[in-house]
Amino acid sequence: MEWIKELYEEQNGILGYRQMTITVNRRHETHFNKKRIRRLMQILHLKSVCRKKKYNYIKSTPEVTAENILNREFYADAPDEKWLTDVTEFKYYVGAEVKKIYLSAILDIFDRRIVSYRIGTSNNNQLVFETFNEAVANNPTAHPLFHSDRGFQYTNKTFHNMLMEAGMRQSMSRVGRCIDNGPMEGFWGILKSEMYYLRKFSSKEELTKAIEFYNTKRYQLKLKCMTPMEYHSAAAA
């Protein structure tokens, strides 16, 4: 039980019994099952934070639209076959002042890693374009199916041309169907519920650290109890 208490405190209370089971077994080379860990956490009165779901829609007149080619096929046989993207809002606090920031990110379905991201003070085309350019620069041979919602940045003709020049096919969620971009929504849920809602960010750098933690230190059951970057490296070996 000491291991559980130590990990719970170390991770600021973000670990539910499933994540706790994976982390205990990875750290201590044990084979506890999730039922036992759940029971021990109940005895210790340890609970993880619950996720909050928020759906925001921005009306716009699209210049370019695409079919939902992804069609909720949330799996891939190798890295860089399918990328998902989205933008979401965060806040951080400098004294009593509240500052809004926006996170644009691209996620690989295969290993659930964040391929690239950008943090900005405005939810605009430039934020999305820079995120995409970074992903292409770091993965010049990648030509994935590129899926997004129908936000104004992604229905922009300039962005569509950028995708075509990079040799990527464009796919878009149906109107009002957040589940069509499910893994991306799942990433937002993890980031916000485990690393954001628990405390107030005091700088943009804290958001950067949270993303790096997700990519390199957060184990996932669907990734054979590896982190996204571990799973990515194993596939490339």
Roles of regions detected by a PLM:
Residues 1-78, 177, 227-236:
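Basic, flexible linker segments flanking DNA-binding modules
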Residues 81, 113, 121, 133-137, ...:
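Retroviral integrase
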Residues 157, 164-168, 190-237:
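C-terminal domain-tail junction helix/linker
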Residues 10-13, 27-29, 74-76, 93-94, ...:
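Conserved, non-catalytic sequence blocks in retroelement Pol enzymes and Pol-derived host proteins
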Residues 50-55, 145-150, 164-183, 199-203:
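RNase H-like polynucleotidyl transferase catalytic core
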Residues 72, 76-115, 122:
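An active-site-proximal beta-strand-loop segment
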Residues 99, 118-139:
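Active-site beta-loop-alpha junctions of metal-dependent nucleic acid enzymes
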